[in-house]
From Swiss-Prot:
Keyword terms of this UniProt record: Endonuclease, Hydrolase, Metal-binding, Nuclease, tRNA processing, Zinc
Required co-factors: Zn(2+)
GO molecular function: 3'-tRNA processing endoribonuclease activity; zinc ion binding
Residues bound to Zn(2+) 1: 61, 63, 133, 201
Organism: Saccharolobus islandicus (strain M.14.25 / Kamchatka #1) (Sulfolobus islandicus)
Taxonomic lineage from the root: Archaea, Thermoproteota, Thermoprotei, Sulfolobales, Sulfolobaceae
Cofactor: record remark: Binds 2 Zn(2+) ions.
Binding-site residues, Zn(2+) 2: 65-66, 201, 257
Protein's name in the database: Ribonuclease Z
E.C. numbers: 3.1.26.11
Length: 291
């Protein structure tokens, strides 16, 4: 199970309804923050989302609406006496930006900060992919590893209830049971891992389409409603995002990075769903659960 909290779904500058980009992804105790617009630390703390529980932060690019909240988040972690290593992914300039800011503000983190290009553990991977914006930018693909599970329905039909047999089958061992040899390949099924992709700011481009194919959730730049000039500014409009979702055969599309010029987004959803019916437009502080 993966939960995605939409902390900030706006763009450029905050509005009454939408804060700046920030998304918290949770999976069984692992907390990943994607982008960190101004005010993110307040949103995390005010909603008891555990600022110090964040293990990994991924920044898509160096525009202020995506990164100006990062210093505050890290400073608050220090004030809360964090000890655990914080892992950060981001553009090449991010490290210099942070450490120069630390130097001028006389801040010395009480914990280790490690800059990484990707992340892997026994349950999940985080990879970057190329996006197409006006500055160096990258998206993030969070993937659960596939898991092997016992076909409990088949075991029940065959009235096999011995947990020792189940354990050996899961270990890939052939088991003799009631005069019959049970082969693991006959009783094991692969549960496909969930995948979540976040583009940050981007025009619709082939590198994004190829990287997000088949994901369970695509969080895509949808800055404008229908302006054909969106690409001129390195952004997508709603139809662009929906076409990417359709071509990439994703399961669900979340429209985000909504320009503050729009108070009513009813038309955004109508436009998106004409092209890609499984589209949503989350409000700030909404969340979804993928299973």
């Amino acid at each position: 199970m993966i939960q995605i909290f939409f902390l900030g779904t706006g763009a450029g500058s905050p509005s009454k309804k939408r804060k700046l980009p920030a998304f918290l992804v949770r999976r069984e105790g692992l907390n990943i923050l994607l982008d960190c617009g101004e005010g993110t630390q307040y949103t995390l703390m005010n909603n008891k989302l555990g600022i110090n529980s964040i293990k990994i932060i991924g920044i898509t690019h160096m525009h202020g609406d995506h990164v100006f909240g990062l210093l505050g988040v890290i400073a608050s972690m220090g004030l809360l006496d964090r000890k655990e290593t914080l892992y950060i992914l981001g553009p090449r300039d991010l490290k210099d930006f942070l450490y120069t800011s630390f130097e001028y503000s006389k801040f010395n983190p009480s914990f280790k900060i490690e800059f990484i290009d990707n992340y892997n553990d026994q349950n999940i991977t985080i990879a970057t992919f190329k996006t197409c914006h006006t500055v160096e930018s990258q998206g993030y693909l969070i993937s659960e590893r596939d898991r092997v599970k016992i076909d409990e329905e088949k075991l029940e039909k065959e009235k096999i209830k011995d947990w020792r047999v189940m354990r050996k089958l899961k270990e890939g061992k052939t088991v003799e049971y009631n005069g019959k040899f049970l082969k693991p390949e006959d009783y094991l099924v692969i549960k496909r891992g969930l995948k979540v992709a976040y583009t940050g700011d981007t025009i619709p481009c082939q590198s994004v389409i190829e990287s997000v194919k088949g994901v369970d959730l695509l969080i895509h730049d949808s800055t404008f409603l229908n302006e054909p000039s969106a690409c001129t500014y390195g952004h997508s409009n709603v139809a662009d995002a929906a076409k990417v979702a359709l071509e990439a055969s994703v399961k669900l599309l979340a429209l985000t990075h909504i320009s503050p010029r729009y108070e009513d987004v009813t038309e955004h959803l109508k436009v998106a769903r004409r092209i890609f019916p499984k589209s949503i437009l989350p409000d700030d502080l909404s969340y979804i659960t993928l299973k």
